[in-house]
Amino acid sequence: MAGYMVLIWDDEAAWDAAGEQDVEKTMRAHRDFGARYAHALRGGSRLYPSGTATSVRHDRAGITVTDGVFAETKEHIGGYYLFEAADLDQALGIAKAVPCPHGWVELRPVMPGSEYRPA
């Protein structure tokens, strides 16, 4: 089994404009997703809006801490799931089932620490 992470990219303005029924429908879909894939899930959570983010940048001059997200973009990471799958095809099947009515998901394999090799 290999580890995978799904990053859930959302349009925050669409969520702000969504009605309570739309929000509850999506949260119910996430609960159903969690129940359906409980055997594979290893973690996941909804994230607070991007306005609560703090960016920490490392460069030759040192470390800079700033309020807010690192880039100006319409979509922001609204949550994530961490799970295990037998292969990429199975991981894609799980990723396609992630509820995301106001955005898209990004699937990435998780690199085991034993495979990390600094350049």
Q: For the regions a protein language model found, what residue spans apply to each?
A:
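Conserved, structured core segments of small domains
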Residues: 1-119
